[in-house]
Design a protein with these regions (language model features):
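Loop/turn elements at helix/coil->beta-strand transitions in domains of secreted/extracellular proteins
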Residues: 2-4, 27-30, 81-82, 103, ...
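A mature extracytoplasmic/lumenal domain signature
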Residues: 7-12, 35-37, 82, 89, ...
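Stable alpha-helical elements in mature extracytoplasmic
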Residues: 15-18, 37, 129, 133-136, ...
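Accessory terminal helices/loops
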Residues: 40, 51, 142-147, 155-232
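Beta-strand-turn-beta hairpins that frame and shape the catalytic cleft
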Residues: 75-84, 101-107
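Metallo-beta-lactamase
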Residues: 88-91, 95-173, 177-179
Length: 232
C-alpha cells in the first residue's frame, strides 16, 4: 500500500523521533500535524534531537530532522473514509490532536489516554492545567467509542474504551498520593504498590521528581516549563 501521510499528534519526541525509519521505507509520505501542533513540533525538534539523540541515547538516538507540515483541515480522508480531527486537546501535554473514525467508533487518542501503564503527569504543573485533561477525558467518554487506541499501553493492548477511565483513576491516585507523600521516593513507592509491575516506569519517576521534589529537568520543553513550579 502507498503511505500518504504520517500524522504526528503532538510535540513529545517519542511520537516523531522515529521518523527516520518510517521515511526510509516511505520517502514520499507527507509528515503532517494539526495546526499549532505542527509549530510546536518544528520548534521543539532541534532541542529534542540534541537532548535525546545526542545526550541521552547517543549513537542510538535520532539525528535527522524532518519538516512537519501544518494541516489546517478538520479531517483527513483515508481510503474513502473521513477521519475527524478532534481539535487540540489537553492530555499529558497541551495541544494534542486525537482522531475519530465515526463509522467504526474508533478513537485514536494519542497521549490523551494511557492503558495499564504509568502515566506521564509531569507537564501538569498546576491543578488548573490538570483540570483541562479531566475535561478532555469527559469529552472522549461522551463519544462512546467502541475502540480506543491509547498513546501508551502495556504489551497486552486491548483497545478497550476502559482505558479512558483507567487514565482518570491513575491521575487521581497520583495526585492524592502526591499530596500525602513527603518526597518523590515515597510517592513512587506508594504508586508501585497501587500499580505493581506496570510498564513505562520513566513516567512515574520523572512525574514524581518534577512535581514533588521540584526537579528542574533539562529535557523539559517548552523551556517555560522549567520556570513553572509545581502547584501541588
Amino acid at each position: 500500500r502507498e503511505l500518504k501521510y504520517i500524522f504526528i499528534t503532538h510535540l513529545h519526541p517519542d511520537h516523531y523521533l522515529g521518523l527516520e525509519v518510517i521515511k526510509s521505507y516511505y520517502p514520499d509520505a507527507r509528515v503532517i500535524a494539526y495546526q499549532k501542533a505542527a509549530d510546536d513540533i518544528n520548534d521543539a525538534y532541534d532541542f529534542k534531537i540534541d537532548y535525546w539523540g545526542n545526550t541521552v541515547l547517543k549513537s542510538n538516538g535520532a539525528n535527522i530532522k524532518f519538516s512537519v507540515e501544518k494541516w489546517q483541515q478538520d479531517e483527513i480522508t483515508l481510503e474513502g473514509e473521513q477521519i475527524k480531527i478532534l481539535g487540540l486537546l489537553c492530555g499529558d501535554c497541551t495541544d494534542i490532536a486525537a482522531l475519530w473514525l465515526e463509522k467504526s467508533r474508533t478513537l485514536i487518542a494519542s497521549d490523551l489516554v494511557f492503558a495499564d501503564c504509568h502515566v506521564w503527569i509531569a507537564d501538569m504543573r498546576t491543578p488548573e492545567i490538570l483540570k483541562n485533561w479531566f475535561k478532555t477525558l469527559d469529552t472522549l467518554e461522551a463519544l462512546e467509542p467502541l475502540r480506543v487506541i491509547p498513546g501508551h499501553s502495556s504489551a497486552a493492548l486491548t483497545l478497550h474504551p476502559c482505558a479512558i477511565s483507567f487514565t482518570l483513576q491513575y491521575i487521581n491516585d497520583f495526585i492524592r498520593e502526591l499530596k500525602r507523600s513527603k518526597d518523590a521516593a515515597q510517592l513512587v513507592a506508594t504508586m508501585d504498590r497501587l500499580y505493581p509491575d506496570y510498564p513505562i516506569r520513566i513516567c512515574l519517576e520523572y512525574s514524581a521528581k518534577i512535581l514533588k521534589d521540584r526537579y528542574v529537568w533539562p529535557g523539559d520543553w517548552p523551556l517555560s516549563l522549567r520556570h513553572l513550579a509545581s502547584g501541588y
